[in-house]
From Swiss-Prot:
Pfam families: TatA_B_E. The Tat system comprises two distinct complexes: a TatABC complex, containing multiple copies of TatA, TatB and TatC subunits, and a separate TatA complex, containing only TatA subunits. Substrates initially bind to the TatABC complex, which probably triggers association of the separate TatA complex to form the active translocon. The gene is tatA. This is Sec-independent protein translocase protein TatA. Gene3D superfamilies: 1.20.5.3310. It is found in: Cell inner membrane. It is a single-pass membrane protein. Belongs to the TatA/E family. Residues 47-76 are annotated as: Disordered. GO terms for biological process: protein transport by the Tat complex. Keywords: Cell inner membrane, Cell membrane, Membrane, Protein transport, Translocation, Transmembrane, Transmembrane helix, Transport.
Length: 76
């Protein structure tokens, strides 16, 4: 009683097709597939950019210390 059998799902599918029609369901499926594809492409682009950022050499700081005194700017 807790789970649905395949027959329950087939009846639900037939009712949904009768209500919305196959054309509407096909359009929804295409839109959903396009959204998933766009998300995957975006993730690939984000992962492709990440190694490029890591490959940039960092500036090596020598053993010299620079002592700087900061003065506050007053409003006139």
């Amino acid at each position: 009683m807790g789970s649905f059998s395949i027959w329950h799902w087939l009846i639900v599918l037939v009712i949904v097709m009768l209500i919305f029609g196959t054309k509407k369901l096909r359009n929804v499926g295409q839109d959903l597939g396009g959204a998933v594809k766009g998300f995957k492409d975006g993730m690939k682009e984000a992962n492709a950019d990440k190694p490029a950022e890591e490959a940039q050499p960092t500036q090596q700081v020598g053993g010299h210390t620079i002592d700087v005194e900061v003065k506050e700017k007053t409003k006139s």
